[in-house]
Amino acid sequence: MTNSNLRTENHFDYVKITLASPERVMEWGQRTLPNGQVVGEVTKPETINYRTLKPEMDGLFCEKIFGPSKDWECHCGKYKRVRHRGIVCERCGVEVTESRVRRHRMGFIKLAAPVSHVWYLKGIPSYVAILLDMPLRDVEQIVYFNCYVVLDPGDHKDLKYKQLLTEDEWLEIEDEIYAEESEIENEPVVGIGAEALKQLLEDLSLEEVAQQLREDINGSKGQKRAKLIKRLRVIDNFIATGARPDWMVLDVIPVIPPDLRPMVQLDGGRFATSDLNDLYRRVINRNNRLARLQEILAPEIIVRNEKRMLQEAVDALIDNGRRGRTVVGANNRPLKSLSDIIEGKQGRFRQNLLGKRVDYSGRSVIVVGPKLKMHQCGLPKEMAIELFQPFVIHRLIRQNIVNNIKAAKKLIQRADDEVMQVLQEVIDGHPIMLNRAPTLHRLGIQAFEPKLVDGRAIQLHPLVCPAFNADFDGDQMAVHVPLAIEAQTEARMLMLASNNILSPATGEPIITPSQDMVLGSYYLTALQPDATQPEFGDRSATFAGLDDVIHAFDDTRIGLHDWVWVRFNGEVEDDDELQEPLKSETLSDGTRIEQWTYRRDRFDEEGALISRYVLTTVGRVVMNHTIIDAVASA
């Protein structure tokens, strides 16, 4: 591909998520413009100018950092149109390019003081606490400026490495150190805040700690051993990924592209903005104030308070509400942080990446389809014509019914008989997939042969309900059409409902009749205790075949539980305990009749069976006839 405009495909095997180093974060946001100017750092909390409605320079929507807000137009308007592609305006410094770059170009905020990443500090488990082998409460005391931590005990005999000291305790020790009679030469070093945490993490030699832990694990057991293994696992993962523990303390914060946190003007001149902009603004304001305080050498207590506020602002940006008070906006609504956008059912992954809308799919309520075979489903005509429209259009043109796509679509809208006939031809042998959420195992999505039905509900065979965990009280199912021949073949061979009789989890049948099917089968074959058994030859209760019984039942000449004599020449298994027939007689033509409790057989002179009549109920005839039909058509 020589043309640079053509997109090249990047083939990759996997996506790896690791900790980002400060240099990597700056790489994401920092760019060198064609004129050599380096841009990327967001230094101002402003978003847009409310007079000109244009983004403020070096602000959260800066066109120099993120790209122009209008295609092929710089900020000041000197350069317009595509012919100036790639030029950097000498007046405003904006590169002339497409506005869609604002969807992927990032910026960054350089922090005046390090801050701890709230995920690794307050997550479960707390990786910072595990790595430092300190209680989470102690680590929090350090980060949020409540306690000092000893970074180097020096010559002081009462201090230990990583020991916590309150403000008063440290003041007492300072008095000792700087007293005239003090013998301490090597002064102890203490720290507070995320800077101290970063120092502690930098001091960790992962390989040495891992080696020591392995030795300790061999000589320990119980709770202590479990704790050591937990710490070793975290350290081994850091070593394997090449990440450094001090990267869990942030020096640089990435600013996501402006089109992913938009600001839109409403009717009446007011603006609606993403919550992220407010959270970023808090961080920038506090960061700038801290930088100014450090510049003018403000008292330590004021600087420390500003550092704590910066830490809380970054916490709220990354995960609002994880620690401390939740930051709220107008009408006391908690602001949506980066974590809130990513996590949960409505988050970016589950809602937008995994839960994308797909073409050639539909959704409707399911109802029972008792006349369907197990591998079939009833698909409403209205849905089928929409789902299979490309196939129908192709066939209509191929059969010279219409000349072009437009004419075919008009014909389809009228839903003529001709179109329905073509649709029937298209769906014959074209499986569709039915899915019921939640798809908890592979049988939650299965393939079926569609049968066109009237109405707007999908018809489903009752036997496949346990696999989908479906019932008919208003459940909905999604329909998907496999397009490629390979997909259709796979659906037919592997996913057809009649090929998925056993549960993949237990190996036991998942296609089992239940509830109304069992009750119906019982009711159909039940014997009525007070029903009288007719004599053989009674014209109203003797039939020449199973079909005659069913016709008589359909005409309401006999009831479901009435006893009937029906001719049936097949094998009969009965529980007749009599060794001898109730009655046996030989007729004048040499044929012999044997009367049993539930059957009457007639044999010729040589003992061959001529005819057999069975005494049974109409319901049992219906059941038997249904099974014979099902087996014959399988």
Curated annotation (Swiss-Prot):
Cofactor descriptive note: Binds 1 Mg(2+) ion per subunit. Binds 1 Zn(2+) ion per subunit.
Assigned EC number: 2.7.7.6
Gene: rpoC1
SMART domains the UniProt entry points to: RPOLA_N (SM00663)
Primary enzyme class: transferase
Binding-site residues, Mg(2+): D471, D473, D475
Catalytic activity: RNA(n) + a ribonucleoside 5'-triphosphate = RNA(n+1) + diphosphate
Stated role: DNA-dependent RNA polymerase catalyzes the transcription of DNA into RNA using the four ribonucleoside triphosphates as substrates.
GO biological process: DNA-templated transcription
GO molecular function annotations of the record: DNA binding; DNA-directed RNA polymerase activity; magnesium ion binding; zinc ion binding
Cofactor section: Mg(2+); Zn(2+)
Keywords from the UniProt entry: DNA-directed RNA polymerase, Magnesium, Metal-binding, Nucleotidyltransferase, Transcription, Transferase, Zinc
Quaternary structure and interacting proteins, as annotated: In cyanobacteria the RNAP catalytic core is composed of 2 alpha, 1 beta, 1 beta', 1 gamma and 1 omega subunit. When a sigma factor is associated with the core the holoenzyme is formed, which can initiate transcription.
Binding site for Zn(2+): C74, C76, C89, C92
A GO cellular component entry from the record: DNA-directed RNA polymerase complex
Protein name listed in UniProt: DNA-directed RNA polymerase subunit gamma
Domain of life of the organism encoding this protein: Bacteria
Sequence similarity: Belongs to the RNA polymerase beta' chain family. RpoC1 subfamily.
SUPFAM superfamilies: beta and beta-prime subunits of DNA dependent RNA-polymerase
